Regions:
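PLP-dependent enzyme catalytic core of the Aspartate aminotransferase-like
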Residues: 235, 239-257
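Conserved PLP-binding catalytic core of the aspartate aminotransferase-like
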Residues: 190-224
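Active-site phosphate-binding strand-loop segment of PLP-dependent enzymes
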Residues: 2-54, 71, 79
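Hydrophobic beta-strand scaffold residues
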Residues: 49-50, 191, 229
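Conserved active-site segment immediately N-terminal to the catalytic lysine
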Residues: 65-77
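Active-site cofactor/substrate anionic-group-binding motifs, chiefly glycine-
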Residues: 1-3, 228-232
Length: 257
């Protein structure tokens, strides 16, 4: 579901949540949320905004500070062409203050003079961001070992993005999707979703009713041509196909196939 800004505004006014969580680009629906409108209205209401950008980092523009996004997490495995297993995260001072209000240093690594915060302890080390942030604090606490291979992967992904340039990467993904959509439309297929909210790196197409759930076509594309496209999930399962144009796959040679 794509939320209009006034829908979020009404819900925030009615329920007064402390926290709103959104997915920037939802690959299951191929739609993107209008964060540039939603973020500022949540900031005005004093609501924290968290956004999952796993499917859009490196493929679509999103401006964390300008759009008033308080916390953002992502992944390497989509538009950055990296392996799964590492999640880039950014938070602002508002979120850092909330996180540190629950800071408790575990006994095994607790330095002399450490003072715990008043908030409840975080039950999982994996999600204890207050302790993770101490990696860069003067204490340099280390409560678990990072996967070094993933840090190398993240560094390489960043190098690739910087070498191409962010705007050039966005343009490449956008051009590839536009080309795919023009070709599909020329074939007589119907695109899914509202044009203004479509992602720049995933395209949805209605499966022609004559083809049923479309699985035979998907299998034939994979077996005969080495091309794999997806179906969807939930209410859209068997109703649309999804074609991803992300990262290294998003190249002219692949699009023209």
């Amino acid at each position: 579901t794509v939320f209009e800004a006034d829908q979020i505004a009404d819900a925030v006014s009615k329920h007064q949540p402390r926290f709103v969580a959104l997915v920037h680009g939802d690959t299951s629906t191929t739609m993107a949320q209008p964060l540039d409108e939603i973020g500022p209205l949540c900031r005005e209401a004093g609501t924290i905004v968290y956004v999952d950008t796993t499917a859009t980092l490196g493929g679509m523009s999103f401006e964390v500070d300008k759009w008033c996004l308080d916390a953002v997490s992502s992944g390497l495995q989509k538009c950055l062409s990296g392996p799964p297993g590492c999640s880039p995260v950014t938070i602002n001072d508002r979120v850092a203050e909330i996180i540190n209000s629950r800071k408790h240093v575990e006994a095994g690594i607790r330095p002399e003079g450490a003072i715990d915060a008043d908030g409840p302890i975080v039950q999982s080390n994996y999600f204890d961001l207050a302790m993770l942030m101490d990696y860069w604090s003067p204490m340099r606490l280390n409560h678990h070992t990072e996967a070094t291979s993933m840090l190398y992967a993240a560094h390489t992904c960043a190098q690739v993005v910087l070498n191409e340039g962010l705007e050039a990467g966005f343009a490449r993904h956008r051009m590839a999707s536009q080309a795919i959509r023009k070709g599909l439309t020329a074939m007589g297929l119907e695109l899914f979703g509202d044009e203004k909210n479509r992602m720049d790196n995933v395209t949805g197409i209605f499966i022609p009713k004559i083809l049923g759930d479309g699985e035979q076509v998907r299998s034939q594309l994979l077996e005969d041509f080495g091309i794999e496209i997806g179906t969807s999930f939930g209410p859209l399962k068997g109703k649309i196909w999804r074609i991803g144009t992300m990262g290294y796959v998003c190249r002219k040679a692949n699009i023209l196939r």
